[in-house]
UniProtKB/Swiss-Prot annotation:
Alphabetical keyword list: Methyltransferase, S-adenosyl-L-methionine, Transferase
One example GO MF annotation: (iso)eugenol O-methyltransferase activity
Catalytic activity: (E)-isoeugenol + S-adenosyl-L-methionine = (E)-isomethyleugenol + S-adenosyl-L-homocysteine + H(+)
Pathway the protein acts in: Aromatic compound metabolism; phenylpropanoid biosynthesis
Highest taxon in the source lineage: Eukaryota
Tissue specificity remark: Specifically expressed in the peltate glandular trichomes on the surface of the young basil leaves.
Binding site for S-adenosyl-L-methionine: 202, 225, 245-246, 259
Protein name per UniProt: Chavicol O-methyltransferase
Length: 356
């Protein structure tokens, strides 16, 4: 068909805006990979160690890169500034200086609230390759998940069969737990005050549980996770580890904590977990759920988009999902809980307290 005969009903301005929108999403991965590169090169750490803004020439001396690629590095910094990971300032000699933003402070390696390990896990080829199988997954029944199509095994089998990847993932989850625990014990401590015993289901190496017992010294915590996850971890009088299966049995306690657990499963499996939790706490107890509630805090910058990204990731990895409040209500009610309380406490995520 001749171009002049195509009726697209768009003005020139609309046409070019539409093209820019497509291109923006076509190359959105460039932001992700530039972020990954910044962490791998240690740019945030170098700036932080310097303790004040650095010029491009200072950065180039401090960062172990091929000096013939200095101009390319400047372009990387320009992209990262545009993504709000760094800011530009003018120095006395008019050379541009770079400094940290709140977001890049979360990328400092070894910092208490760093999210750098999580970024590196999510952007590792093991976890990015499944996205290339999305259309095939929709069309065929060969694989239960996109992850399985890409890797030849399930997500959990991959972590169990490759210990280095398992440790990589555990550290990513630990860094997330430290940030969540910081907010929970600082701003929502009343949620855990008065609890004598708590089981952190899927609590990994106990990062979250350790922070909780430090904040509430009268509490005793138990971490329940798969045997290979808790193997070798030492219990104390306040914190113990149990290797087990949450689908089979959950130890009794005043409260059960589910942080980023239910979203890994479809409704059928999620319902089984919640029923086990309800039985474990009994009347007078509660289940504390920290997870995404799609649409909550949607008016906060980037939150809804993050929630939808997480939803697509859960579909890719597990054929699971993030849930709206209506979907959460149905699941909580079906599990036999009589009431719940929702608190939009964690930005992209929310706090749900479910009562038998």
């Amino acid at each position: 068909m001749a171009l002049q005969n195509m009726d697209i009903s768009l003005s020139t301005e609309q046409l070019l805006q539409a093209q820019a929108h497509v291109w923006n999403h076509m190359y959105a991965f460039a932001n992700s990979m530039s972020l990954k590169c910044a962490i791998q090169l240690g740019i945030p750490d170098i700036l932080h160690k310097h303790d004040h803004p650095m010029t491009l020439s200072q950065l180039l001396k401090a960062i172990p890169i091929n000096k013939e690629k200095s101009q390319s590095f400047q372009r990387l910094m320009r992209a990262l500034v545009n993504s709000n990971f760094f800011i530009e300032e003018n120095s006395n000699n008019q050379e541009v200086c770079y400094w940290l933003t709140p977001a890049s402070r979360l990328l400092l390696k070894g910092a208490p609230l760093t999210v750098a390990p999580l970024v590196q896990v999510v952007l590792d080829p093991t976890f990015t390759n499944p996205w290339h199988y999305m259309s095939e997954w929709f069309k065929h029944e060969n694989h239960a998940t996109q992850f399985e199509a890409a890797n030849g095994c399930t997500f959990w089998e991959k972590l169990a069969n490759k210990p280095s990847m398992g440790r990589f993932f555990d550290e990513a989850m630990s860094c997330d737990s430290r940030l969540v625990a910081h907010v929970l014990t600082k701003d929502y401590k009343h949620v855990i005050d008065g609890i004598r015993t708590l089981v952190d289901v899927g609590g990994g190496n106990g990062t979250m549980a350790k922070a909780i017992v430090e904040a509430v010294p009268t509490m005793k915590c138990t971490v329940l996770d798969l045997p290979h996850v808790v193997a070798g971890l030492e219990s104390t009088d306040k914190l113990s580890y149990i290797g087990g299966d949450m689908f089979q049995s959950i130890p009794s306690a005043d409260a059960i904590l589910l942080k980023f657990i239910i979203h890994d499963w479809d409704d059928e499996e999620g319902l089984k977990i919640l029923k086990r939790c309800k039985d474990a706490v009994g009347i007078g107890g509660k289940v504390i759920i920290i997870d995404v509630v799609v649409g909550v805090n949607h008016d906060v910058d980037e939150v809804l988009e993050d929630q939808l990204h997480f939803d697509m990731a859960m579909m890719s990895y597990f054929n699971a999902k993030e849930r709206t409040m209506n979907e959460w209500e149905k699941l909580i009610s079906a599990a036999g809980f009589t009431s719940y309380k929702l608190t939009p406490a964690f930005g992209v995520r929310s706090l749900i307290e479910a009562y038998p």
